[in-house]
Amino acid sequence: MRKTLKLEIRKPQYVVCTDITYAQVDSWYDHCRRDLKLDLIYPEDREDKVYPCIVWICGGAWLRMDKSAHLAYLSRLAQNGFVVASVEYRTSNEGTYPMQLQDVKAAIRYLRAHAKRYRIDTNRFGVMGESAGGYLTCMAALDQDSSLDVGEYLEYSSAVQAACPWYPPTDASAFPYDDVEKAAMSPESQLMGFNVMTHQKEAWDRSPVSKVTAAAPPFLIIHGTEDHTVPYSQSEKLYNVLEKEECDVTLLSLDGADHADLMFFQDEVWAEIVHFFREKLFREV
């Protein structure tokens, strides 16, 4: 049997590039250097088009992360008209905050610096992440302190125009730990470099809820109502502060969902995410 198809080109090819070095940082007691890398999914077609970029930040309690773990799902965003970058950042085993946020901002600057190569619209950046990555998503969107921009490509902005944190820790000063010893061993304390229960002011100052202003970009916050790792109230706090500042914010609650629940990977949730980023990043700027 033979078949012939006469086709019109209506969709681009989607290219996956892994392990792109976006920065080099000190390692092993500052004696050595190591690469920080990102994975990229971008459309390739015959037209000279550029696309909004969404930066994904993996979770893992700031203790571990795998930038490639969610590429299958992130490809959904690429197929809806976005460049998608999944970025590596240093964990709290390597150093304390704000090192991790500095890495995320460095990745965003790198992507802007190489926008032509990867067909990125430099004016349209979104950021999305889960849990620990949700915290970094919030901070990347809210904390515009110029001292956080370190390394290369400093002539480029690290600002983003939309944010979608999943089950993010938003107030490190208010986690419900039973006692000081448990708090000292918590992922939040390891990230900050101090006990968040005994240093509540310092913990607050490094929390997303303390960084909200009326200039915040649009937010879609997603959280399960039965989260036993990061309390649902953490997202409610951020939502309330953003709403008080009259910011563009939506809290999408997943009824009965626990932390990193399979509910987050259902079509209905991804439809909401795609709608949010298309609405916020495809509009006129």
Give the ranges of each region predicted by the language model.
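Alpha/beta-hydrolase superfamily serine-hydrolase fold, recognizing
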Residues: 1-285
